[in-house]
Amino acid sequence: MRTMENENLRVQISDHGAELSSIYDKAADREAVGIGDPAFWNRHAPVLFPFVGKVNGGFYTHKGVKYPMGQHGFARDNEFECIENTENKTVHRLVSTEETQKVYPFDFAFTVTQELSGRTLTITWNVENTGDDDMYFSVGG
């Protein structure tokens, strides 16, 4: 778990899925992104990539090859590498591997940056196509 903190907020981000897990408002003395009940839902604010939503029938075809894809892609279920973590900035990266290419045949680097300034948390997603083919994707969170 990575933590960013200033005089207003304490923010926690998991390396698993680069998921925002907690925003604690110090002035209000309350959790803004609550810890859910894992009996019902064990996520908080998942990052969705390379698909948002379901693909028809759980499969899609690219260049004549059929690929399985679960709802909302796979990023939320993968460990991201934390490449920066300071009191006001956290950067996570997920890159394509042999495993991701079994379901998503593209070379990519997906970076999630969270920056804390005052009472504002800014989240930036950057998708880089590191291959030669056109890459189709969507991002959500």
Region spans (language model):
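Surface-exposed acidic/polar loop and edge beta-strand patches at domain peripheries
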Residues: 1-126, 130-141
